[in-house]
A protein has these predicted regions:
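Radical SAM enzyme [4Fe-4S]-AdoMet core and its adjacent flexible, acidic
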Residues: 4-111, 115, 130-133
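Generic detector of isolated residues embedded in canonical secondary-structure elements
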Residues: 12, 68, 117, 160-163, ...
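Flexible mid-to-C-terminal extensions adjoining Fe-S/redox cofactors in radical SAM and related proteins
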Residues: 127-216
């Protein structure tokens, strides 16, 4: 009913998978069966001591689940039960501009977060983190040096990204996650990188299979 009420307006129904539901493909299928066509199921990002946190030893299970999701995704779309999974979207003909390919995260440069008391932070995830308050909208205080630091944070300043085959698809990942797990906005969060590459592998395979089918 919700999706129908949207009419031709865009929407996404979004969920999160954790260590407690690594069979997340079932959640995607359930949402599709309920009539939703625009679906996103995101991996949780939590400290490793949380019982819900995703850890590297879970990666084989998660990768297998993305493969299972991709196979069923192709089958359903081919059989007339079409739906779209956000992380399997890839535009091989147009895609983002060069700037977006080099810098995927706009925190602190393209946008900021403002708290109820007027404090400015690079994004909502940085709110309250020591050393990341950029100023206040109440007194026109603003840290332009920090702004420049975030604006310069891109593939060209991230050594670990320089040899990654997926770098121009993700643009270097999330600055907040990088800082939370490595202590440096220039050092990407390893789990995020590995999950991004796996999803991209699936997305490219799906695009190739569907293009080949369309050409026949």
């Amino acid at each position: 009913a919700f999706a129908k009420k949207r009419g031709d307006k865009s929407y996404y129904v979004r969920g999160t998978f954790t260590a407690r539901n690594l069979d997340f493909a079932n959640d995607v299928f359930a949402l599709a069966d309920a009539g939703f066509e625009q679906i996103s199921i995101e991996p949780v990002v939590l400290p490793s001591d949380s019982p819900y946190a995703l850890t590297e030893d879970m990666l084989p299970t998660i990768f297998a689940e993305y493969d299972r999701l991709a196979a069923e995704y192709i089958k359903r779309r081919r059989d007339g039960r079409w739906f779209n999974f956000f992380h399997f979207m890839v535009d091989l003909d147009h895609g983002p501009c060069v700037k977006k390919r080099v810098k995927g995260c706009g925190a602190g440069g393209e946008y900021v977060a403002v708290t109820p008391v007027g404090d400015i932070y690079p994004c909502h995830q940085f709110v309250g983190r020591p050393g990341f308050r950029m100023g206040s909208v109440l007194n026109e205080e603003f840290d332009t040096a920090m702004q420049s630091r975030f604006e310069d944070n891109c593939l060209l300043t991230k050594p670990q990204c320089s040899s990654c085959w997926a770098r121009f698809y993700c643009g270097g990942g999330c600055s907040a996650n990088a800082q939370a797990f490595s202590g440096d906005i220039r050092v990407p969060y390893s789990m995020e990188c590995q999950l991004e590459k796996k999803r991209l592998e699936c997305a490219l395979a799906i695009a190739a299979i569907e293009r080949e089918a369309a050409a026949q």
